Amino acid sequence: CCGIPNAACHPCVCTGKC
């Protein structure tokens, strides 16, 4: 994620705030 297209990745994973 974080700019890399991935359906299995959630935005919160990038920020570390899930």
Swiss-Prot record:
<keyword id="KW-0528">Neurotoxin</keyword>
<keyword id="KW-1015">Disulfide bond</keyword>
<keyword id="KW-0872">Ion channel impairing toxin</keyword>
<keyword id="KW-0629">Postsynaptic neurotoxin</keyword>
<dbReference type="GO" id="GO:0090729">
    <property type="term" value="F:toxin activity"/>
</dbReference>
<dbReference type="GO" id="GO:0005576">
    <property type="term" value="C:extracellular region"/>
</dbReference>
<comment type="similarity">
    <text>Belongs to the conotoxin A superfamily.</text>
</comment>
<keyword id="KW-0379">Hydroxylation</keyword>
<keyword id="KW-0008">Acetylcholine receptor inhibiting toxin</keyword>
<protein>
    <recommendedName>
        <fullName>Alpha-conotoxin PeIVB</fullName>
    </recommendedName>
</protein>
<dbReference type="GO" id="GO:0035792">
    <property type="term" value="C:host cell postsynaptic membrane"/>
</dbReference>
<dbReference type="GO" id="GO:0030550">
    <property type="term" value="F:acetylcholine receptor inhibitor activity"/>
</dbReference>
<dbReference type="GO" id="GO:0099106">
    <property type="term" value="F:ion channel regulator activity"/>
</dbReference>
<feature type="modified residue" description="4-hydroxyproline">
    <location>
        <position position="5"/>
    </location>
</feature>
<keyword id="KW-0800">Toxin</keyword>
<comment type="function">
    <text>Alpha-conotoxins act on postsynaptic membranes, they bind to the nicotinic acetylcholine receptors (nAChR) and thus inhibit them. This toxin selectively binds to the fetal (alpha-1/beta-1/gamma/delta subunits) mammalian muscle nicotinic acetylcholine receptors (nAChR). It blocks the elicited currents completely and dissociates very slowly from the fetal muscle receptor.</text>
</comment>
<feature type="modified residue" description="4-hydroxyproline">
    <location>
        <position position="11"/>
    </location>
</feature>
<keyword id="KW-0964">Secreted</keyword>
